[in-house]
Amino acid sequence: MKRQLIIGVMGGGTAAQTDVDSAYKLGALVAENNWILLNGGRNAGIMEASAKGAIKNGGLTIGILPDATNTNTSEYIQIPILTGMGNARNCINILSSNVIVACPGGAGTISEIALALKNQKHVICMNFDIGTIFDKYKEFIHHTKKPENAIEIIKSLTAI
């Protein structure tokens, strides 16, 4: 039996409204493709928006949370995984995802990109300029400005 794709959507807990809107649309498109959306599970920013987009469009969401309690968990996360691991949970986010979409964020998002590339996972940077620091891994890095294009890249990478 073929497993469903798990799309990791990484990004900041604080984000510009345009990035929140794009994350919502991305979540909706992930759901429409019958993929599972995985993110950091928080009730803010990119995490909240992408999960909301997926749920509102019939998707399944998994949140890998840094805490040992549900205090800051998004209401749009159906399967919260409480780790109590803090930022170390980023390893679970990345290793559990088939493809990563990195939305604007901070050091946490950069660490997730680094972990993904180190593990030879493809990263789609959506409206997120990561500069040249990861040029060594350019075969795994893809850039787009639109959620629809991110979906097309995922399909081409996974031969769907």
How does the language model describe each region?
Residues 1-62:
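Glycine-rich beta-alpha loop segments
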Residues 5-7, 121-124:
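Hydrophobic beta-strand segments of well-ordered beta-sheets in folded domains
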Residues 16, 70-71, 132, 150:
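Flexible, glycine-rich phosphate/dinucleotide-binding loops
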Residues 21, 41-115, 119, 127-130:
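Acidic/glycine-enriched connector segments
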Residues 23-26, 89-90, 150, 154:
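Generic hydrophobic alpha-helical segments
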Residues 80-84, 126, 141-153:
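Short acidic-hydrophobic, aromatic-tinged amphipathic segments that line or gate anion-handling sites
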Residues 136-140:
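Acidic, glycine-centered active-site loop in nucleotide-sugar glycosyltransferases
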Residues 154-160:
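Short, hydrophobic alpha-helical segments
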